[in-house]
Amino acid sequence: MLSQINAFLEANQTINVKTNEPLSKYTFTKTGGPADLLALPTSVPEVRQLLVAAKQNQLPITVIGNASNLIVRDDGISGLVIILTAMDQIDVQGTTVVAQAGAGIIQTSEAAYSGSLTGLEFAAGIPGSVGGAVFMNAGAYGGEISDVLTSAEILTQDNEIETLTNDELNFSYRHSLIQENGSIVLSARFEMAKGVAPTIREKMDELNALRAAKQPLEYPSCGSVFKRPVGHFVGPLIQKAGLQGHQIGGAQVSEKHAGFIVNRGGATATDYLTLIAYIQETIWHKFEVRLEPEVRIIGKKSE
């Protein structure tokens, strides 16, 4: 693969590309092995250029957002990893907000507030990117991205730019079509309603205070680990199983909110994954409830 990597680097000298880059520098858990190549494009043409070069050199492509709801395995990721955080422009026009994929959801909700637009208050404390939020239909406190998104501009596997409507994105709970078709979200368009700025700010502050009171924001974590199973809430299930505070290596079921796993220091991705599996097995054994990860898990599996 070394010759392929060298050829790729030769073709992309004008783009910020790092080799053997530890992804623990980027993930919210502070865990994860290296990427063979990590690219930080600043524009759509650069993204398209990267895809062309990767395909020419038969390099696998992985796109990640803000890495807030992500676990990268300790052996890292083969080929090219693209992080879009440098593509973070947000534009407010009337009641429409258009945000590039690398823009933060928090920053996008703040931009909406600055235009006295209501609808994204629920997202005021979600640490992910717009692209990641579209990818997984991120949500909190009764709201989801699909509630306000009208369309998304995507880059297909054939390197073609397309616009998909809300319906075409096939949203459901923590799911979108992007998870199935391998496309890259480039930007999202949100249609909002005019509101009263102080009321919007009050709601955002209220939800942020609730988040701070209930979530373990003082430690690195990957956010909500499991999807909510039908008829149950994850945190109480884990508490009832006696797993709150349970620790494997440096990864611990949060003592503040059992639906979170925090890095108490020196955790590895393997610690996280071992603890996740243990929780799943225990909950199934005790309650016959299957917990499905909400967190995205990627990277090379150990032999």
UniProtKB/Swiss-Prot annotation:
Tree of life domain: Bacteria
GO CC annotation, single: cytosol
One GO process term, biological-process aspect: peptidoglycan biosynthetic process
E.C. numbers: 1.3.1.98
Database matches in InterPro entries: FAD-bd_PCMH (IPR016166), FAD-bd_PCMH-like_sf (IPR036318), FAD-bd_PCMH_sub1 (IPR016167), FAD-bd_PCMH_sub2 (IPR016169), MurB (IPR003170), MurB_C (IPR011601), MurB_C_sf (IPR036635), Oxid_FAD_bind_N (IPR006094)
Intracellular or extracellular location(s): Cytoplasm
Keyword Hydrolase carried by entry: no
Gene3D superfamilies per the UniProt record, alphabetical: 3.30.465.10, UDP-N-acetylenolpyruvoylglucosamine reductase, C-terminal domain (3.90.78.10), Uridine Diphospho-n-acetylenolpyruvylglucosamine Reductase, domain 2 (3.30.43.10)
Cofactor or coenzyme needed: FAD
Domain FAD-binding PCMH-type stretches: 30-195
Catalyses which reaction(s): UDP-N-acetyl-alpha-D-muramate + NADP(+) = UDP-N-acetyl-3-O-(1-carboxyvinyl)-alpha-D-glucosamine + NADPH + H(+)
Signal peptide: none
Catalytic residue positions: 174, 224, 294
GO molecular function: FAD binding; UDP-N-acetylmuramate dehydrogenase activity
Keywords: Cell cycle, Cell division, Cell shape, Cell wall biogenesis/degradation, Cytoplasm, FAD, Flavoprotein, NADP, Oxidoreductase, Peptidoglycan synthesis
Pfam family, one: FAD_binding_4
Pathway(s) the chain acts in: Cell wall biogenesis; peptidoglycan biosynthesis
Chain's role: Cell wall formation.
HAMAP family: MurB (MF_00037)
Family stated for the protein in its record: Belongs to the MurB family.
The name this protein goes by in its record: UDP-N-acetylenolpyruvoylglucosamine reductase
Organism of derivation: Latilactobacillus sakei subsp. sakei (strain 23K) (Lactobacillus sakei subsp. sakei)
Gene label: murB
